[in-house]
C-alpha cells in the first residue's frame, strides 16, 4: 500500500469529529507545504510492537547525530491520539519559540518546544495554527 493510501486509511479510520478535523488539517498542511514528501509512520518498531501513535509527516529534513550519522525525517507531523490531535513542528532551534509566538493566540491548545496539542480544530484559531506550520516549513536548524 502506498503512502497516500496509508494516510487515507488512517484518517478515515478515526471516529468523528476527529476524522473531519484530521482531513481538514491534512488539507491545510498540504496547501502550506506545496509539493513535499509525504510520510506515514504506523507507530510500530521493527518487532511490530506499538511504540507511538501513528502519524503523518510532511516535508523532509536531515537529522545529524553526535556520532556523525544522519537520517531523514519529516518537518511537520500530525497525529490523532486519545486526547485529541498533535501537530509536530520539528527542527526549530529555539525550543521556546512556538509557545512564545503562538500559544496565547491559538485558543484551547498546549504548546511545547515542538508540539501543539488540542482537542478539536473548532477550539483553536486555525489561521494561527497554519502560521505555525508555515514557520516550521520555512525555518530549520
Enumerate the predicted regions with their spans.
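Charge-dense, helix-prone N-terminal extensions
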Residues: 1-141
Amino acid at each position: 500500500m502506498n503512502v497516500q493510501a496509508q494516510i487515507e486509511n488512517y484518517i478515515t479510520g478515526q471516529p468523528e469529529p476527529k476524522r473531519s478535523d484530521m482531513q481538514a488539517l491534512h488539507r491545510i498542511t498540504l496547501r502550506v507545504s506545496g509539493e513535499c514528501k509525504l510520510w506515514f509512520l504506523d507507530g510500530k518498531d521493527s518487532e511490530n510492537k506499538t511504540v507511538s501513535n501513528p502519524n503523518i509527516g510532511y516535508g523532509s529534513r536531515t537529522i545529524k547525530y553526535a556520532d556523525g550519522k544522519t537520517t531523514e525525517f519529516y518537518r511537520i507531523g500530525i497525529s490523532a491520539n486519545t486526547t485529541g490531535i498533535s501537530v509536530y513542528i520539528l527542527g526549530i532551534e529555539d525550543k521556546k519559540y512556538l509557545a512564545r509566538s503562538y500559544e496565547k493566540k491559538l485558543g484551547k491548545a498546549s504548546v511545547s518546544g515542538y508540539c501543539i496539542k488540542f482537542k478539536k480544530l473548532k477550539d483553536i484559531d486555525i489561521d494561527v495554527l497554519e502560521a505555525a506550520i508555515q514557520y516550521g516549513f520555512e525555518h530549520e536548524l
